[in-house]
Amino acid sequence: MVVPLVAALFLVNITPAQAEQAGRCGPVRVPGAEHQEVRRAVDLTTAGGVTDPADWAGLTPAGLPAPTAVPGTQVDGYFPDDSTSNTNHGWNHDSQFVIRLPARWNGGLVVSGSPGVREQYANDRAISDWVLQRGYAFAATDKGNTGVGFYAGGDAIVEWNQRVTQLTRAAKALVREHYCRPASRTIATGLSNGGYLVRWQLENHPELYDGGVDWEGVLWREDGPNLLTFLPPALRGEPVFPAASEFLWPFYRQHYWELTQRIYREALDPDYEGAEADYDYASRPAARRAVREIALTGRIGKPLLTLHGTLDGLLPIDQDSDVYAEMVRKAGRDRLFRYYRVEGGTHVDSLYDAFPDRLRPLTPCHRTAFAALERWLGGERPPASATVDRPDTVSPTECSLG
């Protein structure tokens, strides 16, 4: 359910003619969109804007400060698609997007795909709020399919990559029309599946971006490791995750391991009929062919900063980002790459609230990495890749990468 969080928001639907006047320069028209609704807003953030709190629940620590108001224009809409899993706005239509255009623009654009199988508002608290306050325009997509049945249309993960590319091109064109000049920089960022999308975009469409920040992106490799190689052993009770994360395993087992294994196996190997714990990726040639279509190579074409928590209970760091960092090195692209292994970080920051003496949130580390990328694009090299120690005093707002 999409709601304005403050009744006095002054969000109004406007006609195309009014939208033209509302823009700082040109019309608010998203190229290729089948439907769009444009609103002027006193606040584009989660403190007062149109969003879906259920979509971003659990992704950030409770102590994250509320954002200050950012006035501007919001565009909600969808691109042509024939699947209907996303019910936001009562549209029952996938490939939904949100684009936010702050009145005080810094010249930049941030593009993001949703984590997990969430919808287009999933990054609002973790990413949109913060980049809007820095003056960026922000665009996010539901990736073309949502929910635990996301795989129903086939080639679902292939579509994710296509939808992020589609949105990036459309958002860049919209920004150029709205502000009467092109974006001076375009940054891709996202977490989990969204981090995978950052990696894929910088490998396959570096011409669209100036750089990216990958927050615990999912690794897909035809030869493994990938979700389908390490989740079945975890379900069988084999040691997959670091022993130091054992206190988190009951949570991840209950909420993530089997569900994640099942839905991604359904997406990539729908003919398998056995128990998920017994799944053997190496013996499933159809699955290998499907993963080949979405696989990463490490051949990034623009600067990328990756961060990953050492206590991630869904994506074991030694079978995910450690491997991706080595792929980048072997591809000869390490000059474009920084990798920060964050001690005490886990996959979802809400767990920090339950274990503040053992974990640390990654949200502030993502913001530090984003600021480091900004400086890198301005000519200042970021800190060297490193394992970032957990400090004695942990804050939901502070993180030093070195």
Predicted regions and their residues:
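Cap/lid segment of the alpha/beta-hydrolase catalytic domain
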Residues: V111-K172, E177, G345, S350-R358
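Gly/Ser-rich "nucleophile elbow"/oxyanion-hole loop immediately N-terminal to the catalytic nucleophile
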Residues: L101-N106, I157-Q162, A170-S192
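Primarily recognizes the serine-hydrolase "nucleophile elbow" in alpha/beta-hydrolase
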Residues: L64, E119, R185-L235
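A fold-wide structural signal in alpha/beta-hydrolase
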Residues: V75, T84, N88, V98, ...
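C-terminal subdomain of alpha/beta-hydrolase-fold enzymes, centered on the catalytic histidine
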Residues: P270-G402
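Accessory cap/linker subdomain of secreted extracellular hydrolases
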Residues: A22-S95, I99, W215-R299, A384, ...
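Loop/turn elements at helix/coil->beta-strand transitions in domains of secreted/extracellular proteins
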Residues: W105-L109, Q133-F138, R181-T186, E207-G211, ...
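Secretory targeting and sorting signals
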Residues: M1-E20
